[in-house]
């Protein structure tokens, strides 16, 4: 093949890779085969840099039905029902083309869930943007990205009819060159009706269903495995274009198919399209496959085998059906006005054979491309900045009056209400959503089949992960679990989306290795196994990587959907308690960031026993009918958590407690919660706290038209204006 070096460079392959490919094939590869190896060995598909670190994740528990390795994780939720869930990134496409990038991220994660046999019932998203407050082009571009991404998520999810019920939105200048768009979906099915991505049974037909294949998304998997430069805008053709109405038809057709016994295996065509779906299905089953690419439904004229194998056109699935049922399968999809064609069959050769009008155009062994793809052991190095980052503390910065600090923190885009975002999403479609977004610490969906509730929350504080990559990742697991527990549910399992910079940088690889250690440690200690997840590397532009951002989505179960705990003030004269101990801990805090522009200090102490005691306390207090409301104490500390409860409940607060150093109301000590109770239940609450071994301290009472805590005194009207209106004012100021 001529110009081999240029071809390899275009496919992000090295000469070493090329020699390896020749050894596997026993000959020189052709262009189609190079395209296949390039996509399947990309970071995006093969996890070659990260796989060695993921192997130690705890993945088993009595309630885990399916752990990592399939399209999504599955847990038992009782009464013969299962919850299916996963989180994925669509970072690179969303930065290049925000609307379609975010929309197709939603589409892809929905397919991961319904390909397992589950009807999707809830979506979350975790979004990270750059500095939208800047007055220059960078700030304007970030505001454009926010508007585009949110519109894309809403546009797709709303049309498919799956509620988007929560998530998180945060901002930091480290995301100016790479935004992060992490999408989560959860579905429900019967636990004995789960489908897997396997192609087995010699002679069984391989069927293509869904949209026609076009040239959109060509090279998307390879693009997502590289860092950005100034040339990035030229990559728009590598971003897929979504059609949510077709997705809805595909969803319903698949669910109808699952009621039959025709299916051997099914796989969504995601990154690397037909290549990944076919190789993954054959790889999991240890089988081979013959595919006739001229049978693939095409949207454009003149498409080549190379393009058909690597296109990332959306809303497509690959099905392995039982021999003899193919016409019935085709009939179901055509009834839903979808393309459906038999394009191949399963073999026992362990080889993928591709044909084009009768001519063989590729012949590749399955295992070396999929299950046995190369793994890298990249060098790691502790970042130099960690040597001096702990020198900063609350005692090394100037004193700021509590009132001034409170107003600044309350107006932080990390804190203020995100109604502008979630009001663009249909959160109530399907009528299973227990409460509106923003009114609970977790997002909660009712399981109509058994009267239970599934709670879910996504969390990560990138500042914590920057100052302590291991502890910050563990803290994300704790925080996601804490949110779930605050709603009254028992945390059960996580899915993750591990967003990091360039793995070719040893310091980034060290951050990643430490992050996975933190997740392993926390999940073991808290008994919340990892059941699915995603790794997104190369989140870097012009040599600048994002902060380590291991987003954790925790899923939990509440046995009674009528016992879900809100997170805002309910009734005047109720008493508010702080549960847990407060220390003077400001490492990575919002206080240091907003008031002094510093991301530094020592991470608050991690104590898994305290965390578990807090979860047990809140869950038991709720079961005993003691709680009116519960709120996790997170960024901004007690002051900000109380302010959110007051604003959302439209009730003031009169504090009658303060710390010796009043700044501790902004401390971010872990494993704490605020609870609101009826005064008559004070004794019962304190008895339960003693029983569990956790401190419960009364802070004050609900009511009035002012917010008063230590030296803070603010009219509720002003507090509500800052909390509810700041986000919209900031994001829409260009319009």
Swiss-Prot record:
Mg(2+) 2 binds at residues 112, 268. GO terms for biological process: 'de novo' IMP biosynthetic process. Gene3D superfamilies: PurM-like C-terminal domain, PurM-like, N-terminal domain. It comes from the Bacteria. Its EC number is 6.3.5.3. ATP binds at residues 47, 86, 496, 533. Substrate binds at residues 89-92, 111, 240, 312-314, 536. The active site is at residues 44, 90. GO terms for molecular function: ATP binding; magnesium ion binding; phosphoribosylformylglycinamidine synthase activity. One of its GO terms (cellular component) is cytoplasm. Keywords: ATP-binding, Cytoplasm, Ligase, Magnesium, Metal-binding, Nucleotide-binding, Purine biosynthesis. It is found in: Cytoplasm. PANTHER family: PHOSPHORIBOSYLFORMYLGLYCINAMIDINE SYNTHASE SUBUNIT PURL. Belongs to the FGAMS family. HAMAP family: PurL_2. This is Phosphoribosylformylglycinamidine synthase subunit PurL. It comes from Nitratiruptor sp. (strain SB155-2).
